[in-house]
Amino acid sequence: MAAKDVKFGNDARVKMLRGVNVLADAVKVTLGPKGRNVVLDKSFGAPTITKDGVSVAREIELEDKFENMGAQMVKEVASKANDAAGDGTTTATVLAQAIITEGLKAVAAGMNPMDLKRGIDKAVASAVEELKALSVPCSDSKAIAQVGTISANSDETVGKLIAEAMDKVGKEGVITVEDGTGLEDELDVVEGMQFDRGYLSPYFINKPETGAVELESPFILLADKKISNIREMLPVLEAVAKAGKPLVIIAEDVEGEALATLVVNTMRGIVKVAAVKAPGFGDRRKAMLQDIATLTGGTVISEEIGMELEKATLEDLGQAKRVVINKDTTTIIDGVGEEAAIQGRVGQIRKQIEEATSDYDREKLQERVAKLAGGVAVIKVGAATEVEMKEKKARVDDALHATRAAVEEGVVAGGGVALVRVAAKLAGLTAQNEDQNVGIKVALRAMEAPLRQIVSNAGEEPSVVANNVKAGEGNYGYNAATEEYGNMIDFGILDPTKVTRSALQYAASVAGLMITTECMVTDMPKGDAPDLXAAGMGG
């Protein structure tokens, strides 16, 4: 086992604070409308340019093991804030740095670290309640656009695109961000249900100019099995041909003679058919087939429930106004399923979302709700170079998370003002003893840090602006972009309550642990390996 290097007390804390400051100073230059970019070197490809706090934090590793421990703990703050609300990572880092710096000063002055932590925790718990009281619901698209704009670093087009996307697909809808092809940002809304499976044979294409299969008011056969024997399908095919409508087959797979016969029938014009694989795998495939059945008013033909394909009738088939299938996707537009059944299915999936334990499962379930309830919007990010594209995509992603958080828990005045107001309200808060009271003061003083940093990045004097803002009340604050004082809500500078709350909670959690650290243990740096030749051989 490698030898360990151990540091105690003030020695350990000084080293740790140095690491915290290196990381926090690198991250906090990005805060606010006049925050700067950080360039990150990559081992291959062009460097990445970013204004996203968590991306900067993730890149930082320090050579000194003790300093690195401090940096890694603050990195955890940024990551946690990012996971919880998708934004506010820089604010969380600035708050953590402020609480740690003030807290360690108090420890050096002889305060009890455990009592300090209790005081900080008490102040933060009260601050979270105050934030909730200040919070205003965010429902109209103007407010949504403003939140998106602020989070995308004052990029108005991004804010408007997100608001428009939410308008079109609803609050439940799925909005994804992709690379665009041009220089402009675009919004693409997919009505109906789309899944990522294309046609099984290019011979089904009936619109050669677009390379797609378009079928008007088709029947939809849903089978949870592989179809390779055409005999199983003959009764259904004959019934569909009699009805004079096209048929879409969605099955685990269609292969061999079954696929060949369908292609021949289509080419001869006997019956228009198109076959696609069912989306997903395993249990998720079964669930998605059931979703499609609910949407189109059909039944999934599955041997698990004793149904056979040969005995299927037209009543078992779903219907839709239109189905469009291209190489990679299938879109079902206006299924004829009953609204009550669709809402029931959505309710069922929402229940599963509440019980889901992994983020991946939750995301997939939310996608299913969106496909049933609203639709899917894709924001295509345009840029001149790939480096700019990456940077912009990260900002749009942040803005999207921020607007979702705003819709969820409401908004408060932005620009660091909400935390300043909360701190002023809690000025009279006291705890069981003097050391805990100092802890409360440490947390309340730290709540000014985001405002001061925004002002400092804008090249103004933080103390002057902070005093002016504190002298005002309500939503009165400082707009760093235009260098004006006024009502932050009127300026359109809003922060999602969830983002501000998460930033404060995670910052205080990690800072409290670091203040109470008394000893640090790390591996000794390995010396150079001894030179084997020097041992000498008996001659």
Swiss-Prot record:
Q: Which GO terms describe its molecular function?
A: ATP binding; ATP-dependent protein folding chaperone; isomerase activity
Quick one: which residues bind ATP? Answer: 30-33, 51, 87-91, 415, 479-481, 495
The consequence of residue 449 to S is: In strain: JCM 7000
Effect on the protein upon substituting residue 184 to Q? In strain: JCM 7000
Gene Ontology cellular-component terms for this entry are:
cytoplasm
Q: What is the effect of changing residue 347 to T?
A: In strain: JCM 7000
Q: What is its main location?
A: cytoplasm
Mutation effect (residue 351 to Q) = In strain: JCM 7000
- Give the highest taxon in the source lineage: Bacteria
Ordered alphabetically, the record's keywords are: ATP-binding, Chaperone, Cytoplasm, Isomerase, Nucleotide-binding
Biological process according to GO: protein refolding
Question: What SUPFAM superfamilies does the record tag this protein with?
Answer: GroEL apical domain-like, GroEL equatorial domain-like, GroEL-intermediate domain like
UniProt catalytic activity? ATP + H2O + a folded polypeptide = ADP + phosphate + an unfolded polypeptide
Keyword Isomerase tagged: yes
Altering residue 481 to Q: what's the impact?
In strain: JCM 7000
Q: Which InterPro entries match?
A: Chaperonin_Cpn60_CS (IPR018370), Cpn60/GroEL (IPR001844), Cpn60/GroEL/TCP-1 (IPR002423), GroEL-like_apical_dom_sf (IPR027409), GROEL-like_equatorial_sf (IPR027413), TCP-1-like_intermed_sf (IPR027410)
Quaternary structure, from the entry: Forms a cylinder of 14 subunits composed of two heptameric rings stacked back-to-back. Interacts with the co-chaperonin GroES.
Q: Which family is this protein grouped under? A: Belongs to the chaperonin (HSP60) family.
Record NCBIfam families: GroEL, PRK00013.1, PRK12849.1, PRK12850.1, PRK12851.1
Name of protein: Chaperonin GroEL
UniProt source species: Enterobacter agglomerans (Erwinia herbicola)
Q: Which gene encodes it?
A: groEL
